[in-house]
Amino acid sequence: MNCSSTAVLLETVNFAAEKHRNQRHKDPEGTPYINHPIGVARILSHEGEITDVEVIQAALLHDTVEDTDTTFEELESVFGATVARIVQGVTDDKSLPKAERERQQVEHAPHCSHQAKLVKLADKLYNLRDLNRCTPEGWSAQRVQEYFEWASQVVKGLRGTNAAIEEKLQQLFLERGVKL
């Protein structure tokens, strides 16, 4: 990675950290939310061997529009059209009911750009590992299992994107008795 890539990624991390600064995970420790997008970016870099800086940027920013006051226009103006487009490809419409958002994720997964599919895969892997580590407050064992089953449906539509990440997801699904 060259110096300008490092500077770009640090600027992206700083932007995401500012946007997510008051958010916490639903785990008992109240982990800072920024750990999630950083973890998703790290999975892409370290496990998926992704070196495309724009994909890593999109991973760092993937929840900013969905969960903060960030707009796609702001992302495009600060980080460029490609990063904004990748983030758009992984962003749910929060105005829709949760069940409809989940249905759309399954339906839209096969039609995303390759770059958006990478972010989706890493996001699912991070979330499933997190659920194995610690059940969110208010979640039953059944809800966790249902999340795994739903995530497997999304991941089915992302097959052929990144063998290393898909293999790790497959292992998690097998451990849970969920067919892919």
UniProtKB/Swiss-Prot annotation:
The lineage of its organism: Eukaryota, Metazoa, Chordata, Craniata, Vertebrata. Pfam families: HD_4. It catalyses: guanosine 3',5'-bis(diphosphate) + H2O = GDP + diphosphate + H(+). Gene3D superfamilies: Hypothetical protein af1432. Mn(2+) binds at residues 36, 62-63, 123. One of its GO terms (molecular function) is metal ion binding. This is Guanosine-3',5'-bis(diphosphate) 3'-pyrophosphohydrolase MESH1. Its EC number is 3.1.7.2. Residues 33-128 form the HD domain. It comes from Danio rerio. InterPro entries: HD/PDEase_dom (IPR003607), HD_domain (IPR006674), MESH1 (IPR052194). The keyword Manganese applies. The gene is hddc3.
